[in-house]
Amino acid sequence: MTNKLRIYEFAKLLEIQNKDLMDILNKLNIEHKNHMSALEENDINLVLEYILQEKEKEKEHAEKRRERLPSHKEGRSGERQAKTFDEKKHTRHGEKASHPYDKRGEQKLQQKSQQDVRQKFDREKRERHQEAIAKESGKKLEGQERKAVVHDQKVVELFPQQEPEKRQAAKPKYEVAKEQKIEKRYQDKVAAKQKTEKATKHRKQLFNVDELTQEEVTVDREELEKIDKEVEDTLLEEEYLQEKHVRRGKKEKLKKRSKEQKEVLKLQTKTVQEEKKEEIVKIPEKITVGEFANLIGKPAAEVIKKLIMLGVMANINQEIDFDVASLIAEDYGFKVEKEIIKSEEEILLEDQEDPEETLQPRPPVVVVMGHVDHGKTSLLDAIRNTNVTEKEAGGITQHIGASVVEVNGRKITFLDTPGHEAFTAMRARGAQVTDIAVLVVAADDGVMPQTVEAINHAKAANVTIIVAINKIDKPEANPERVKQQLSEYGLIPEEWGGDTVFVNVSAKKKIGIDHLLEMILLVADLLELKANPNRPARGRVIEAKLDKGRGPVATVLVQKGTLKVGDYVVVGSTWGRVRAMIDDKGQRIKEAGPSMPVEILGLEDVPTAGDELVCVKDEKTAKTIAQIRQERLKEEKMQQSKISLDELFERIQKGQLKELRVIIKADVQGSVEALKSAIERLSNDKVTVKVIHAAVGAITESDVTLASASDAIIIGFNVRPEVGAMSLAEKEKVDIRMYRIIYDVINDIKAAMKGLLEPVYKEVIIGHAEVRQIFKSSSVGTIAGCYVLDGKITRTSNARIIRDGVVVYEGKLASLKRFKDDVREVAAGYECGMTFEKFNDIKEGDIVEAFEMQKVES
């Protein structure tokens, strides 16, 4: 099979244009139509032979031109001017001026003939002059001697006389052998310069001698011509070699320069390539092929080829992940970085750090923490001179309270976290928004489990701890034992060489309260607490509830900026416009600065405690962010419920699980979370407690409907059911329970869980009946006319049909009648009619055995 090439492919191989190749084909009479025509192997060989011949011709032509180069230096000023004048003259007359090298041989021959004529004329003139002198003096002998002298000094005397006329601007020469002259001329530039200077000096001396002596010279004509020829040959050879050396020097310089330029170009190209390699591209987690191609500046088709080579089949609109895209980008020499794409929510809520000059001192936020009944609320009561403890149900703090205390003209914000273990989550949130934690430990009880928990929360939140040893007024108080116990957890007193402040106090007798406040301010000064009040507000929700008259109410601690009435805010998954703000003393205010707790009204829904409050520019932004968050919460709930249901189903199938469903309604969000956490922790291997709904507010009809459909109980904490909800609950037989103390909730649920455990049952046979007649009914199916043999048959009892000693059915009665009336039971000796659930294959003579499952008391 012959090899064929298209014209454009052959031209590309030869590195010539298609047009030039087609011209060659025309010269060789090779048939073709256009650049897409195919060439046979013979045609290709003909073209190659033609190109080689042309190159050989060019080479021969170049050699001929090189041979015709001038034999002596073209550069004498008079000749140069004449040549330039002739060229200009020819050009003015419309003739094209030829290149200086084109007719160099002819010019040199003309110059040589002109020199010969000039030399002959000079020689004849000198001869006539010498003959005249000889006739007058008659001293021929002397002339002959002079001739011999001249012969000895022929080059020295004749050359200086002829040179000024023949070579107007040429440098003077001195007598040296031809080989020595050429060798010395090109070996050392410095030596050549020195010799030139010597020659100049020697020439001047010779001219001076001639001028002074003015001696008569007689020279033989043939000898003079011979001398002239030798001198001229020497000069021509020397000038040619010099010119050749100059040209060679220029070529070497050009080669050197081109080499340097190539090296510079290589360095520049390398630098550009390195810069290109160092070019960074940021690629997101997912990107379409088209977008990726535009990003790296490559054709999409080329990128798709690379993908295919990697085993990824994708078109221009399909997405590729970061790993695949980074492989291709690195292959092209890019440095890859992963682009972190911010969501719309993150862009809208992006927070920037405040410059140092805008920051101002702010009050410290102090949280009071400790074990239950160690006197946290009593201590806070003593500090703020209020009486909160008596108002709390059971004397236990149920939700977070916030207050501001002024000490020596400076403000301190206090948060009170509940002490019961069910409020762990609330205490953790309290620790996250505070600067200082006051750990209250009873001097008589010492360190308790929740004390350790409080220490861990404070340390995790990087909060400075001040220990308040309370109840020192009691006789059994032992502060030193408390210090010893706390030192085991890293809280070492200052007097022991540590850095933890310990203060002995008595909340009941108000001992050491002032010292505690001074220590709080001292620690706050060391922390250098600052914030920028002149910016949009940001804060945290401490507590939230649904008020019957005011709607959703949130207690917020402002952390940055200033919150004003009328501001649009986003709080968790809800939003709103601040309609009113109420401080800790119950007074309405218009603005709240950093570290100030306030109640805000105007939210669309009840937020979750711990949610961040962010002030935004307008209503549209607030709605957009809230909507995004709500959708995300829905997705998360769907995913979580799917996972939990899968796990639940697996355990139910194994027969290991029973479920108690609970609906929780409470007055504040903190109580909702605490109850939910406490109830769900009651689950064990046999019974699972599942909170199917938890919210803030009164018990509504929708809650009752949900409980009825889900077979759940409703727990109300500090709330009452609506009128319609109560009546609906009675109708649907839904269990609603009201509580004010969390202990009661836990105890009741434990009792309910015990009732759900699988009891032990036994089978009790209550009677037998015989089928004596069969009736067919289109509406109810087969009816068995029976006679009760013994015991009794009840409507709620289970039935077993025995035929020839074999059980053919076991199930429930569908109906029990005497004549046309439904009855609850039929005693022995009476006739009755019976139907069975999903069973009609009844025959005369079958025995019906009625039985019940009775619980065995443990």
Swiss-Prot record:
Annotated positions binding GTP: 370-377, 416-420, 470-473
Cellular location(s): Cytoplasm
Region (Disordered) residue spans: 59-147
Keyword Cytoplasm in record: yes
Region span, G3: 416-419
Recorded coiled-coil stretches: none
Stretches assigned to the tr-type G domain: 361-530
Region (G4): 470-473
Matching InterPro entries: EF-G-like_DII, IF2_II, IF2_N, P-loop_NTPase, Small_GTP-bd, T_Tr_GTP-bd_dom, TF_IF2_bacterial-like, TIF_IF2
Region (G2) residue spans: 395-399
An annotated GO cellular component: cytosol
Pfam family, one: EF-G_D2
Keywords assigned: Cytoplasm, GTP-binding, Initiation factor, Nucleotide-binding, Protein biosynthesis
Gene Ontology MF: a single term: translation initiation factor activity
Region (G5): 506-508
Region (G1): 370-377
Family to which this protein belongs: Belongs to the TRAFAC class translation factor GTPase superfamily. Classic translation factor GTPase family. IF-2 subfamily.
HAMAP family noted in UniProt: IF_2_B
Functional summary from the UniProt entry: One of the essential components for the initiation of protein synthesis. Protects formylmethionyl-tRNA from spontaneous hydrolysis and promotes its binding to the 30S ribosomal subunits. Also involved in the hydrolysis of GTP during the formation of the 70S ribosomal complex.
Protein name in UniProt: Translation initiation factor IF-2
